[in-house]
Amino acid sequence: MLPVVALVGRPNVGKSTLFNRLTRTRDALVADFPGLTRDRKYGQAKIDEHEFIVIDTGGITGDEEGIDALMAGQSLLAIDEADAVLFLVDARAGMTIADEAIADHLRKQDKKVFVVANKTDGVDADSVCAEFYALGLGEVYHIAAAQGKGVRQMIEIALDGFFDDVEQEDDFSDLETGLEFVEEDEALLLKEQERLAALPIKLALIGRPNVGKSTLTNRILGEERVLVYDLPGTTRDSIYIPMSRDDREYILIDTAGVRKRKKVNETVEKFSVIKTLQAIEDCNVVLLIIDARDGISDQDLSLLGFTLNAGRSLVIAVNKWDGMTEYDKERVKSELDRRLGFIDFAKIHFISALHGTGVGHLYESVEEAYDSSTKRISTSILTRIMTMAAADHEPPMVGSRRVKLRYAHAGGYNPPLIVIHGNQVKKLADSYKRYLMNYFRRSLGIMGTPIRIEFREGTNPFAGRRNKLTPNQMYKRQRLVKFHKKSKK
């Protein structure tokens, strides 16, 4: 589960600057949900190989009414969702009444709170930050968010202990040179495939409020008549519900929470961005639910973007399809083709969660997506497919030399990662990379999951070596030198 960091503080202390620094906003998803989360923004950040979620809260004013209203309506919710709270203060402006009021609220929360003095560039940090120790929240950390000074060290301290148990990904560095590789044991690959097939499929139901997440969850559970209970260890109100269908085990991750029967028809659902983002990271397959009558919104695209960024398998359910006119149905299908053309690997189902129409077919696509994302494929098969792709459409020329593809192997799963080794492969045009991706997808029959391809240029294993001639070669060379000298006379 991704840890969550909340940025709290009065206006203009640099929360948004730090947020952008951590999330690298141009490269990472930044989900802004106006009207649903008020002024809170959510983004994904990364330090080395460790990822976490950042919440940027709105500023809190110093008046008593503003403190109570905004803290209760916005920042207090962000603090409740967070594993660590970064309380930002302005080192240049000094401590204010608003800072003291916020500190009073934070002391009442059972959270890890870190006082972060921003804008310490160009000043004596120890001197200007000394007064903030009076807030009674412990150590004061110095940063300059705009320049990135001290940010990394501060985050490492705040999230210390959260990544101790993170499993390391498989290391494929032994295949780097490409001189030789050991073919995988087909029996071991098959055994691993069978092991994964026996595991429950973790399926996250995500979507905007009121698209029918709870209705679909209860429809699925009602059809199967299973016992509903919460698995121990779940956090932040996401409900993990075990169930089975046709001898296949599932764990439904319901970000909206399971509703009692009397509340199924409620028109308003609680929406938590944090629960949704964490469910995406924790699941195997994402079921994105879209309201057919509203069409595709920017919020749908934000959720879709986070799903693709996480590399999760994807199935799309267009809900509330019943009762629509043929004209409206064609209009919705046209919009889907236009706006979702870049995810042609995901299957789209038109359903009615309320009446159960089309719900049964979702399982087939979910299983296909899971099996595709965890498919174990040998190096020989991947290399053979790569060779066929190059034979059907030769790699382009780079300068006076043609790009050469040497071999391919699996680099990871969920999503499938294919590593291609060769010469000048990093100079391949994006169009040819897409061609290879689509060729692998068709050849392997992979649907419902993105494929990632990584290109590696093998180093010359003989670089830096000096040729050592055998005695016989030395004798021949000496004779050639003598002959060359005689011919000049």
Curated annotation (Swiss-Prot):
SMART domains: AAA (SM00382)
GO term, biological process aspect, one: ribosome biogenesis
One Gene Ontology MF term: GTP binding
Transmembrane residue ranges: none
Entry-linked SUPFAM superfamilies: P-loop containing nucleoside triphosphate hydrolases
Highest taxon in the source lineage: Bacteria
Record-listed GTP 1 binding positions: 9-16, 56-60, 118-121
Protein residues bound to GTP 2: 207-214, 254-258, 319-322
Keyword Nucleotide-binding assigned: yes
UniProt keyword annotations, A-Z: GTP-binding, Nucleotide-binding, Repeat, Ribosome biogenesis
Gene3D superfamilies in alphabetical order: 3.30.300.20, P-loop containing nucleotide triphosphate hydrolases
Keyword GTP-binding: yes
Start and end residues of each EngA-type G domain: 3-166, 201-374
Domain KH-like: 375-459
Cited InterPro entries: AAA+_ATPase, G_ENGA, GTP-bd, GTPase_Der, KH_dom-like, KH_dom-like_a/b, P-loop_NTPase, Small_GTP-bd
One of the Pfam families matching this protein, by short name: KH_dom-like
Quaternary structure and interacting proteins, as annotated: Associates with the 50S ribosomal subunit.
Function, as annotated: GTPase that plays an essential role in the late steps of ribosome biogenesis.
HAMAP family, per the entry: GTPase_Der
Family: Belongs to the TRAFAC class TrmE-Era-EngA-EngB-Septin-like GTPase superfamily. EngA (Der) GTPase family.
Protein name per UniProt: GTPase Der
